[in-house]
Amino acid sequence: MSFFAVLLALVIEQFKPLPRKNRVLEALQSWIAWSARNFDAGQSRHAWVVWLMAVVVPTLLTAIVYNALRHYRVLLALALNVGLLYLTLGFRQFSHHFTAIRDALDRGDEHEARRLLAEWQDMDAVDLPRTELLRHVIEHSLLAAHRHVFGVFFWFVVLSALGLGPAGAVFYRMAYLTSRFVAARLQGSEGMGHETLMDLSNRLFVKLDHVPARLTAFGFAVVGNFEEAVNGWRRDAPLWKHANEGIKIGRAHV
């Protein structure tokens, strides 16, 4: 059932991709913000409570609902699998950005390519030379592919094998959203509580992304130059704030 769920979700997403900003994402961000606002009181244990509320509670609810549906009617469980995978596997949420930039470069329109990159990543790309432009496009595309596809798929498979259905996909997506949302929205806030929450959410996401990141890099290495990929991992991992990102990018530079 897991295979068909992934296949159906990807097919649906090809024909009806979710926009980058959508109501589901807004609802999840509101849930994370509510958890932080109501449970983060400035101490380490409060940061744990926020993370458990924001990430683990939706994961447990997904597992409970899935198992209830599976015992009642298998098709309903399959529908839940497909629906949640559709919401968490966001291949088309970033692929059109890459395609548009690639097409602009193929036309020789570097100005348009820079504009599209700046729009995609909210960065200043006006003065980027062509080599740097290409590097940024490759890096961001690879990271997006991992976060929207490979990482979600890994945790879906792991927890699905344990009988928890799409709980793994929800787990990875909520952990990623929590780490990014907290860093983006609370970084400038006063109080040590927010800093503690940011540190915890980032640290936990790095840990749960440890294996998927290396599997993603290994997969690219298999179809490329394995020896150069390993050297790239060793060279680039220490240069990034999160080593997982450096490992994936190290493969992209090969």
What are the language-model segments listed below?
Residues 1-253:
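Hydrophobic N-terminal alpha-helices or hydrophobic patches in metabolic proteins across all domains
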